[in-house]
Design a protein with these regions (language model features):
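Charge-rich, low-complexity N-terminal segments
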Residues: 1-124
Length: 124
């Protein structure tokens, strides 16, 4: 999991304002067992942790969503993480699926932005 702030562009609800979540990430992998094992869970957990740590305690910003002057001012004092997608749980689940799929055979990724609300990206 990671704690981070974001806001939604092109949205008129309360999430258009900067707010934060404790994002929880669940990655499910699939594959054939080799010697009774799918993967080394130590390596797998480290890779998920590294991905989450990149975003932890940052302000996640969709590329181009902030005026350049504001972006430059914020970037001097805070950790900004710029992503190519709108910062929804749905898009985060797809992004994490794609990143983890570079090394693992991922079946699905669930990203929770609250304890009860999650978005799931599933391999088709």
């Amino acid at each position: 999991s990671f704690d981070a702030a974001h806001f939604l562009t092109n949205y008129e609800g309360k999430c258009k304002n900067i707010h934060g979540h404790r994002w929880r990430v669940v990655v499910t992998i699939k594959g054939e067992l080799t010697n009774g094992m799918l993967v080394d869970f130590g390596d797998f957990k480290k890779d998920i942790k590294d991905l989450c740590d990149y975003f932890d305690h940052s302000f996640i910003v969709e590329k181009g969503s902030l005026h350049k002057k504001l972006f430059d001012l914020l970037n001097k004092q805070f950790v900004l993480r710029v992503v190519e997608f709108r910062t929804t749980a749905e898009n985060f689940s797809k992004y994490i699926f794609e990143e983890m799929s570079k090394k693992y055979s991922v079946k699905e990724v669930c990203v929770y932005e609250t304890p009860n609300n999650c978005a799931r990206y599933v391999c088709e």
